[in-house]
Amino acid sequence: MTLLAVDQLTVSRGGLAVLEGVSFSLAAGHALVLRGPNGIGKTTLLRTLAGLQPPLAGRVSMPPEGIAYAAHADGLKATLSVRENLQFWAAIHATDTVETALARMNLNALEHRAAASLSAGQKRRLGLARLLVTGRPVWVLDEPTVSLDAASVALFAEAVRAHLAAGGAALMATHIDLGLSEARVLDLAPFKARPPEAGGHRGAFDHGFDGAFL
C-alpha cells in the first residue's frame, strides 16, 4: 500500500524554486533516504511534505494526518520532564505508547529529568521518541541522527526497523549510514531547479509583491 506519493513537485525557499519535478512513492514497510549536496533543498522538500509550506507546483498524496515530522529542532517543552513531554504528545495524538517510546530510545533512567537539563544527544533522543507516540504511519526526518553517539544511532535505526515492520514508512535526509540495507536512496541533484530564463519554474516573487497578492 502506498503511504506517500509525490508527483512533479516544485518547492521553493525565499520565493525561489530550489527543486522541481520531484516524483517518488513510498509504500508501507519501506524507507527512502534523500541525498544531495548542502543547500540543494532537502529541508525545504521535507518541510513542504510536512505541510509547513505550500509547493509551487505538483501534487502530494497521503492519508489524512499521515505524517510525523522531526525537524532540526527537537520541539521539546523545556520545563516538562522526559515522561511529561511524551505524555503531552500522546494525549494530543490519543495514543498509549509512552512506555514503548521510553524503552525504545533508552530514556527510562531519564524519565523524571526536565528536558532543559538534558544533553544535546539526550534531547535528540527524546525528540525522536515523540515519533513513537504519534501513531502516524509516515515518518519524515531531517538529519535525525545529529548529536547522537554511535549507540544512540543504533537505537534509532532499530526504532525505524520496528516502525517499518509494523507497516509504517520513513523518509529521511541524512548523511549517516543507518545500516538500513532495505532503504532506497534518492539523489536530489538531478532535480535542482533551473532558472526561469532556462525554462525553470518561476518563484512566488518573480513578479513582485503586486503580482503575488493578485
From Swiss-Prot:
Coiled coil: none annotated. GO terms for molecular function: ABC-type heme transporter activity; ATP binding; ATP hydrolysis activity. It is a peripheral membrane protein. Its main location: membrane. Pfam families: ABC_tran. InterPro entries: AAA+_ATPase (IPR003593), ABC_transporter-like_ATP-bd (IPR003439), ABC_transporter-like_CS (IPR017871), ABC_transptr_haem_export_CcmA (IPR005895), P-loop_NTPase (IPR027417). Keywords: ATP-binding, Cell inner membrane, Cell membrane, Cytochrome c-type biogenesis, Membrane, Nucleotide-binding, Translocase, Transport. Its EC number is 7.6.2.5. GO terms for biological process: cytochrome complex assembly. It catalyses: heme b(in) + ATP + H2O = heme b(out) + ADP + phosphate + H(+). ATP binds at G36, P37, N38, G39, I40, G41, K42, T43. PROSITE patterns: ABC_TRANSPORTER_1, ABC_TRANSPORTER_2, CCMA. One of its GO terms (cellular component) is plasma membrane. The keyword Membrane applies. Residues 4-214 form the ABC transporter domain. It is found in: Cell inner membrane. SUPFAM superfamilies: P-loop containing nucleoside triphosphate hydrolases. The complex is composed of two ATP-binding proteins (CcmA) and two transmembrane proteins (CcmB). Belongs to the ABC transporter superfamily. CcmA exporter (TC 3.A.1.107) family. Part of the ABC transporter complex CcmAB involved in the biogenesis of c-type cytochromes; once thought to export heme, this seems not to be the case, but its exact role is uncertain. Responsible for energy coupling to the transport system. This is Cytochrome c biogenesis ATP-binding export protein CcmA. It comes from Rhodobacter capsulatus (strain ATCC BAA-309 / NBRC 16581 / SB1003).
